[in-house]
Amino acid sequence: SGVGDGVDVVSAIEGAAGPIAAIGGAVLTVMVGIKVYKWVRRAM
């Protein structure tokens, strides 16, 4: 057990990190886009 279990957990986290990072990045991009859009609309 010991070492093998640790490796499985790490590989599972690394496997999940990609999609989570992609979703997080998309959400962040949308939020920034909305802020910029509102700011530009108010400036015009």
Curated annotation (Swiss-Prot):
Q: Which residues cross the membrane?
A: 20-37
Which ranges of this chain reside in the Cytoplasmic compartment per its record?
Answer: 38-44
**Compartment(s) of residence:** Virion; Host membrane
Taking the first listed entry, what is the main subcellular location of this protein, grouped into a coarse class?
virion
Please list the residues that carry the modification N-acetylserine: S1
Q: Which cysteines are joined by disulfide bonds?
A: none
| Any Pfam family hit | Phage_Coat_B
Keywords (alphabetical) are:
Acetylation, Capsid protein, Helical capsid protein, Host membrane, Membrane, Transmembrane, Transmembrane helix, Virion
Which parts of the chain does the record assign to the membrane side Periplasmic? 1-19
What is the topology of this protein in the membrane according to its UniProt annotation? Single-pass membrane protein
Identify the GO cellular component terms for this protein. helical viral capsid; host cell membrane; membrane
| UniProt function note | Self assembles to form a helical capsid wrapping up the viral genomic DNA. The capsid displays a filamentous structure with a length of 760-1950 nm and a width of 6-8 nm. The virion assembly and budding take place at the host inner membrane.
Q: How does it assemble?
A: Homomultimerizes. There are several thousands of this protein in the phage capsid.
What does the similarity note say?
Answer: Belongs to the inovirus capsid protein family.
Give the protein name, as stated in the record: Capsid protein G8P
